[in-house]
Amino acid sequence: EAACGQCISLTCDVSPTGVVYGSPTTGHAWSAYTVPLTGFWDYVKEWGGDWMWEMIYPDLGHGFDIDWMISALQAGTLVGATDGSYDRSRNAFVCGAGWIIMDTTTGDRLAGSFSEHSPTAGSYRAELLGLCAINVLLLALSKAGNISSCPSITIWCDNKGAVSRASENSRRIQSGRSCADILRVLRTLRMELPVPVTFIHVHSHMDDKLSWEQLSLEQQLNCQCDTLAKDSVSRYILNQTSNVTRNQRLLPKEAAGIFVQGTKLTSDPTTALRYLLGKHAAKQFLCSEQG
Protein backbone atom coordinates (compact mmCIF):
# COMPACT_ATOMS: atom_id res chain seq x y z
CA GLU A 1 0.00 0.00 0.00
CA ALA A 2 2.71 2.45 0.98
CA ALA A 3 4.71 1.84 -2.20
CA CYS A 4 1.81 3.21 -4.22
CA GLY A 5 1.07 6.07 -1.84
CA GLN A 6 0.23 9.58 -2.88
CA CYS A 7 3.27 11.06 -1.19
CA ILE A 8 6.82 10.56 -2.38
CA SER A 9 8.42 13.47 -0.54
CA LEU A 10 9.62 12.37 2.88
CA THR A 11 11.22 13.75 5.97
CA CYS A 12 14.38 11.69 5.98
CA ASP A 13 18.05 11.49 6.85
CA VAL A 14 20.81 9.72 4.98
CA SER A 15 22.91 7.09 6.72
CA PRO A 16 26.10 5.50 5.33
CA THR A 17 24.13 2.37 4.42
CA GLY A 18 21.01 3.88 2.92
CA VAL A 19 18.04 6.12 3.52
CA VAL A 20 16.34 6.31 6.89
CA TYR A 21 12.66 7.10 6.46
CA GLY A 22 10.58 9.27 8.70
CA SER A 23 7.00 10.45 8.23
CA PRO A 24 5.74 11.95 4.96
CA THR A 25 4.27 15.42 4.87
CA THR A 26 1.06 14.12 3.24
CA GLY A 27 -0.33 10.83 2.01
CA HIS A 28 0.03 7.36 3.49
CA ALA A 29 2.07 6.55 6.57
CA TRP A 30 5.54 5.14 6.04
CA SER A 31 7.45 2.86 8.38
CA ALA A 32 10.89 3.97 9.54
CA TYR A 33 13.62 1.64 8.37
CA THR A 34 16.95 1.57 6.57
CA VAL A 35 17.42 0.14 3.09
CA PRO A 36 20.93 -1.02 2.12
CA LEU A 37 22.49 0.34 -1.04
CA THR A 38 23.49 -1.99 -3.89
CA GLY A 39 26.52 -2.14 -6.16
CA PHE A 40 24.40 -0.72 -8.98
CA TRP A 41 24.75 2.78 -7.57
CA ASP A 42 28.51 2.43 -7.32
CA TYR A 43 28.45 1.55 -11.02
CA VAL A 44 26.34 4.62 -11.82
CA LYS A 45 28.67 6.88 -9.83
CA GLU A 46 31.66 5.67 -11.85
CA TRP A 47 30.30 7.78 -14.72
CA GLY A 48 30.78 10.91 -12.63
CA GLY A 49 28.18 13.36 -11.41
CA ASP A 50 27.54 11.45 -8.19
CA TRP A 51 26.03 14.65 -6.74
CA MET A 52 22.93 13.86 -8.82
CA TRP A 53 22.17 10.95 -6.50
CA GLU A 54 22.28 12.92 -3.26
CA MET A 55 18.78 11.75 -2.29
CA ILE A 56 17.23 8.48 -3.50
CA TYR A 57 13.82 7.19 -2.39
CA PRO A 58 13.68 3.43 -3.11
CA ASP A 59 10.49 1.46 -3.50
CA LEU A 60 9.33 0.29 -0.09
CA GLY A 61 8.81 -3.24 -1.33
CA HIS A 62 12.01 -3.72 -3.33
CA GLY A 63 14.40 -1.31 -1.66
CA PHE A 64 17.35 -0.63 -3.95
CA ASP A 65 16.89 -3.87 -5.90
CA ILE A 66 16.97 -3.13 -9.64
CA ASP A 67 15.54 -6.37 -11.02
CA TRP A 68 12.01 -4.96 -11.20
CA MET A 69 13.25 -1.96 -13.20
CA ILE A 70 15.14 -4.14 -15.66
CA SER A 71 12.08 -6.37 -16.12
CA ALA A 72 9.82 -3.34 -16.64
CA LEU A 73 12.33 -1.86 -19.09
CA GLN A 74 12.34 -5.06 -21.14
CA ALA A 75 8.54 -5.28 -21.03
CA GLY A 76 8.04 -1.65 -22.06
CA THR A 77 6.08 -0.82 -18.88
CA LEU A 78 8.70 1.51 -17.38
CA VAL A 79 7.90 5.23 -17.49
CA GLY A 80 9.63 8.29 -16.10
CA ALA A 81 8.64 11.75 -14.95
CA THR A 82 10.62 14.77 -13.84
CA ASP A 83 10.06 18.32 -12.71
CA GLY A 84 12.28 21.24 -11.80
CA SER A 85 12.13 23.95 -9.18
CA TYR A 86 13.60 27.44 -9.13
CA ASP A 87 12.78 30.26 -6.72
CA ARG A 88 14.74 33.42 -7.45
CA SER A 89 13.44 35.12 -4.31
CA ARG A 90 15.00 32.45 -2.07
CA ASN A 91 18.26 31.86 -3.94
CA ALA A 92 18.86 33.00 -7.50
CA PHE A 93 21.73 30.55 -8.00
CA VAL A 94 20.03 27.31 -6.98
CA CYS A 95 17.67 25.05 -8.91
CA GLY A 96 16.49 21.55 -8.11
CA ALA A 97 15.06 18.52 -9.89
CA GLY A 98 12.85 15.66 -8.79
CA TRP A 99 12.34 12.48 -10.80
CA ILE A 100 10.41 9.22 -10.62
CA ILE A 101 10.79 5.93 -12.50
CA MET A 102 7.73 3.69 -12.29
CA ASP A 103 6.45 0.33 -13.50
CA THR A 104 2.92 1.01 -14.73
CA THR A 105 1.92 -2.63 -14.22
CA THR A 106 2.85 -3.01 -10.55
CA GLY A 107 3.10 0.59 -9.36
CA ASP A 108 6.66 -0.01 -8.13
CA ARG A 109 8.72 3.13 -8.25
CA LEU A 110 12.09 4.69 -7.59
CA ALA A 111 12.40 8.42 -6.94
CA GLY A 112 15.16 10.92 -6.39
CA SER A 113 15.95 14.60 -6.06
CA PHE A 114 19.01 16.83 -6.14
CA SER A 115 19.98 20.48 -6.44
CA GLU A 116 22.61 22.43 -8.31
CA HIS A 117 24.29 25.75 -7.55
CA SER A 118 25.04 27.59 -10.78
CA PRO A 119 25.09 31.16 -12.15
CA THR A 120 22.77 29.86 -14.89
CA ALA A 121 20.28 28.25 -12.50
CA GLY A 122 16.68 28.39 -13.67
CA SER A 123 13.53 26.39 -14.31
CA TYR A 124 14.66 25.30 -17.79
CA ARG A 125 18.02 24.06 -16.50
CA ALA A 126 16.36 22.24 -13.61
CA GLU A 127 14.04 20.38 -16.00
CA LEU A 128 16.95 19.36 -18.24
CA LEU A 129 18.87 18.09 -15.21
CA GLY A 130 15.94 15.84 -14.30
CA LEU A 131 15.74 14.48 -17.85
CA CYS A 132 19.48 13.86 -17.77
CA ALA A 133 19.24 11.91 -14.50
CA ILE A 134 16.53 9.59 -15.82
CA ASN A 135 18.45 8.93 -19.04
CA VAL A 136 21.58 8.08 -17.06
CA LEU A 137 19.59 5.52 -15.08
CA LEU A 138 18.06 4.06 -18.24
CA LEU A 139 21.52 3.57 -19.74
CA ALA A 140 22.83 2.00 -16.52
CA LEU A 141 19.82 -0.33 -16.32
CA SER A 142 20.21 -1.39 -19.95
CA LYS A 143 23.86 -2.26 -19.33
CA ALA A 144 23.13 -4.03 -16.05
CA GLY A 145 20.44 -6.12 -17.76
CA ASN A 146 22.44 -6.66 -20.98
CA ILE A 147 19.55 -5.15 -22.93
CA SER A 148 20.23 -4.59 -26.62
CA SER A 149 16.71 -3.52 -27.60
CA CYS A 150 13.33 -2.99 -25.98
CA PRO A 151 10.10 -1.01 -26.46
CA SER A 152 10.11 2.78 -26.29
CA ILE A 153 10.16 4.45 -22.88
CA THR A 154 8.07 7.55 -22.15
CA ILE A 155 9.35 10.39 -19.97
CA TRP A 156 6.99 13.20 -18.96
CA CYS A 157 8.10 16.76 -18.30
CA ASP A 158 6.08 19.98 -17.91
CA ASN A 159 8.61 22.28 -19.62
CA LYS A 160 7.96 22.45 -23.37
CA GLY A 161 11.39 23.94 -24.08
CA ALA A 162 13.18 21.10 -22.29
CA VAL A 163 10.99 18.49 -24.01
CA SER A 164 11.74 20.04 -27.40
CA ARG A 165 15.51 20.21 -26.88
CA ALA A 166 15.76 16.73 -25.41
CA SER A 167 13.82 15.32 -28.38
CA GLU A 168 16.25 16.71 -30.96
CA ASN A 169 18.55 14.25 -32.72
CA SER A 170 21.31 16.72 -33.59
CA ARG A 171 24.81 15.27 -33.57
CA ARG A 172 26.25 18.71 -32.83
CA ILE A 173 25.19 21.04 -30.02
CA GLN A 174 25.82 24.72 -30.68
CA SER A 175 28.04 26.21 -27.98
CA GLY A 176 25.81 29.26 -27.69
CA ARG A 177 22.74 27.29 -26.64
CA SER A 178 21.50 27.68 -23.12
CA CYS A 179 22.58 24.73 -20.93
CA ALA A 180 24.71 23.35 -23.75
CA ASP A 181 26.59 21.20 -21.23
CA ILE A 182 23.45 19.23 -20.35
CA LEU A 183 22.36 18.99 -23.98
CA ARG A 184 25.73 17.45 -24.89
CA VAL A 185 25.36 14.83 -22.18
CA LEU A 186 21.83 14.05 -23.36
CA ARG A 187 23.21 13.62 -26.88
CA THR A 188 25.89 11.23 -25.57
CA LEU A 189 23.33 9.22 -23.64
CA ARG A 190 20.98 9.08 -26.62
CA MET A 191 23.76 7.69 -28.84
CA GLU A 192 24.60 4.97 -26.28
CA LEU A 193 21.07 4.05 -25.25
CA PRO A 194 19.63 0.90 -26.86
CA VAL A 195 16.26 2.13 -25.61
CA PRO A 196 14.18 4.56 -27.71
CA VAL A 197 13.02 7.38 -25.44
CA THR A 198 9.97 9.57 -26.09
CA PHE A 199 9.71 12.88 -24.25
CA ILE A 200 6.14 14.11 -23.75
CA HIS A 201 4.88 17.38 -22.28
CA VAL A 202 2.48 17.22 -19.34
CA HIS A 203 0.53 20.15 -17.90
CA SER A 204 1.81 21.23 -14.51
CA HIS A 205 0.04 21.89 -11.19
CA MET A 206 -3.13 20.15 -12.28
CA ASP A 207 -3.74 19.27 -8.62
CA ASP A 208 -4.74 22.91 -8.18
CA LYS A 209 -7.74 22.27 -10.44
CA LEU A 210 -8.59 18.60 -10.01
CA SER A 211 -8.78 16.14 -7.14
CA TRP A 212 -6.05 13.50 -6.91
CA GLU A 213 -8.38 10.79 -8.20
CA GLN A 214 -9.20 12.87 -11.28
CA LEU A 215 -5.56 13.29 -12.28
CA SER A 216 -4.03 11.08 -14.95
CA LEU A 217 -0.94 9.03 -14.10
CA GLU A 218 1.42 11.52 -15.71
CA GLN A 219 -0.22 14.40 -13.86
CA GLN A 220 0.08 12.58 -10.53
CA LEU A 221 3.74 11.83 -11.15
CA ASN A 222 4.33 15.44 -12.15
CA CYS A 223 2.83 16.68 -8.88
CA GLN A 224 5.03 14.30 -6.90
CA CYS A 225 8.12 15.35 -8.84
CA ASP A 226 7.25 18.98 -8.19
CA THR A 227 7.29 18.32 -4.44
CA LEU A 228 10.57 16.45 -4.71
CA ALA A 229 12.18 19.28 -6.67
CA LYS A 230 11.03 21.94 -4.22
CA ASP A 231 12.31 19.85 -1.32
CA SER A 232 15.74 19.60 -2.94
CA VAL A 233 15.99 23.39 -3.20
CA SER A 234 14.85 23.82 0.40
CA ARG A 235 17.37 21.20 1.47
CA TYR A 236 20.19 23.11 -0.18
CA ILE A 237 19.15 26.44 1.32
CA LEU A 238 18.93 24.92 4.79
CA ASN A 239 22.29 23.19 4.52
CA GLN A 240 24.06 25.97 2.61
CA THR A 241 26.89 23.74 1.47
CA SER A 242 29.99 25.21 -0.09
CA ASN A 243 29.21 27.17 -3.24
CA VAL A 244 32.74 26.56 -4.50
CA THR A 245 32.21 22.80 -4.44
CA ARG A 246 28.80 23.14 -6.05
CA ASN A 247 30.16 25.27 -8.90
CA GLN A 248 32.81 22.69 -9.80
CA ARG A 249 30.55 19.74 -10.48
CA LEU A 250 30.61 17.85 -13.74
CA LEU A 251 27.62 15.93 -15.07
CA PRO A 252 27.54 12.17 -15.55
CA LYS A 253 29.22 11.19 -18.82
CA GLU A 254 30.61 14.73 -19.16
CA ALA A 255 34.18 14.24 -20.36
CA ALA A 256 35.36 17.80 -19.73
CA GLY A 257 34.18 21.18 -18.53
CA ILE A 258 35.43 24.76 -18.69
CA PHE A 259 35.82 26.54 -15.37
CA VAL A 260 36.53 30.23 -14.87
CA GLN A 261 37.58 31.20 -11.37
CA GLY A 262 36.09 28.00 -9.99
CA THR A 263 32.73 28.37 -11.72
CA LYS A 264 31.65 26.00 -14.47
CA LEU A 265 30.58 27.56 -17.76
CA THR A 266 27.42 25.94 -19.07
CA SER A 267 27.23 27.62 -22.46
CA ASP A 268 29.49 29.56 -24.86
CA PRO A 269 32.67 30.41 -22.91
CA THR A 270 33.67 33.30 -25.19
CA THR A 271 32.08 36.12 -23.16
CA ALA A 272 33.39 34.88 -19.81
CA LEU A 273 36.90 34.28 -21.15
CA ARG A 274 37.00 37.67 -22.89
CA TYR A 275 35.93 39.36 -19.66
CA LEU A 276 38.54 37.48 -17.62
CA LEU A 277 41.36 38.26 -20.06
CA GLY A 278 40.29 41.91 -20.21
CA LYS A 279 40.22 42.09 -16.42
CA HIS A 280 43.69 40.59 -16.23
CA ALA A 281 45.05 43.02 -18.84
CA ALA A 282 43.44 45.99 -17.07
CA LYS A 283 44.94 44.91 -13.74
CA GLN A 284 48.40 44.63 -15.26
CA PHE A 285 48.09 48.06 -16.87
CA LEU A 286 46.76 49.82 -13.77
CA CYS A 287 49.48 48.26 -11.62
CA SER A 288 52.23 49.29 -14.03
CA GLU A 289 54.06 52.60 -14.16
CA GLN A 290 52.06 53.60 -17.24
CA GLY A 291 48.78 53.08 -15.36
Enumerate the predicted regions with their spans.
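Eukaryotic N-terminal low-complexity, Ser/Thr- and Lys/Arg-rich leader segments
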Residues: H28-M69, Q261, D268
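Acidic, Mg2+-coordinating catalytic module of metal-dependent nucleases/exonucleases
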Residues: Q219-L238
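Charge-dense, extended regions
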Residues: E1-K45
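Extended low-polarity, hydrophobic cluster-rich segments
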Residues: C4, C132-A140, L273-A282
